[in-house]
Amino acid sequence: MKLFEYQAKEAFREKGLPTPKGVLVRGMDELDGAFAEVGFPCVLKSQVLSGGRGKAGLIKVVKDAESAKATAKTLFESEHNVRMLLVEEAVDIDREIYLSITVDPVESKIMLIGCAEGGVEIEKLAATDPDKIVTVRVDIAEGLGGYHVNNLTYGMGLSGDLGKQVGAVVRGLYKTFRAYDAQLAEINPLFITKDGKAIAGDGKLIIDDNSVWRQPSYPLTRDYFDSEVEFEAAQEGIPYLQFNGDIALMCAGAGLTTTVFDLINDAGGHPATYVEFGGANYTKAVRTMELCLKTPSKVILVVTFGTIARADVMAQGLVEAIKAHQPKQPIVTCIRGTNEEEAFAILRDAGLEPLTNTEEAVQRAVDIAAGRA
């Protein structure tokens, strides 16, 4: 679960990390109060979960109320579905530093990551100039020690008062990481002001989905989703993604769904949805189709391969979904696996042709969407 920047910074402040003064606004009518509290110049930061906000023009520095309101209006009306802005004081910056904490899955340890250059895309820097990145691994049972922090800051070339300040930030970031069951806690950039103070300029916090139940402060809300249907799917525990294509894809299992998604694109088609009803969701065909039908499409492609999830149960669920929602689009099916012969009979009785070759099913769906079948 990825948190918004304002939420990450709230978590940082709870653990003693310094952040710029900021006020969250959800509409134009809240701007005057925010400007009165924060002052000018200030920064308008769009609260969206996608990365690259600066490059996308979603973070703007403003110097007065008139320009700030015009800029805020543009951001709220942008194609990026901005529903919240963080109005934050502008910081007099001398330099920027990168800090993050994540998990090393190979060594099963917590990994501290630092770079003396902040505001960077760390993945690109790792590929082009890896020597600039310093990593220190921490045994979770042992916990963070002073030598871990010193190894990181010294490795970044930081010493004296600056090294101590950055070290204190590392300790606070580690506390945040552990307290929130995080997969990633990141400050990029960490501002070093001209008077020598360290301030978290940006914040990213991703909570492990398996531990969200331990974090009641962050319930699943509409704010985290671009569309109402994605929110509904998340509430049901059904993985759902929406695209601009015309082939509604219903599959069982993440691996199969991803494979079929790629096959559709390879065949010249364009998915409208990516929906999984495998695993624990394999009896949710009725609800899955209901979600699919909320996105316009020309054809519905159903591909499953059941092992523990029985093919006949999925086929029966699909037939019930068709009876319940009576979709107008043609339906292409390829349901294989445990009890597949029974599944084929169920589909034939419902007037559906059970295909047994995934590539054939994909091609037929693509042809239907293109008007060739």
Swiss-Prot record:
It catalyses: sulfoacetate + ATP + CoA = sulfoacetyl-CoA + ADP + phosphate. Its EC number is 6.2.1.-. It comes from Bilophila wadsworthia (strain 3_1_6). SUPFAM superfamilies: Glutathione synthetase ATP-binding domain-like (SSF56059), Succinyl-CoA synthetase domains (SSF52210). Mg(2+) binds at residues 186, 188. Signal peptide: none annotated. Induction: Induced in sulfoacetate-grown cells but not in thiosulfate-grown cells. ATP binds at residues 35-97. The keyword ATP-binding applies. Optimum pH is 7.5. This is ADP-forming sulfoacetate-CoA ligase subunit SauC. Its cofactor is Mg(2+). Forms a complex with SauD. Residues 9-249 form the ATP-grasp domain. GO terms for cellular component: succinate-CoA ligase complex. PANTHER family: SUCCINATE--COA LIGASE [GDP-FORMING] SUBUNIT BETA, MITOCHONDRIAL, SUCCINYL-COA SYNTHETASE BETA CHAIN. Involved in the degradation of sulfoacetate. Catalyzes the CoA- and ATP-dependent conversion of sulfoacetate to sulfoacetyl-CoA and ADP. Cannot use other sulfonic and carboxylic acids, and shows only residual activity with 3-sulfopropanoate and malonic acid. It comes from the Bacteria. The lineage of its organism: Bacteria, Pseudomonadati, Thermodesulfobacteriota, Desulfovibrionia, Desulfovibrionales. The keyword Ligase applies.
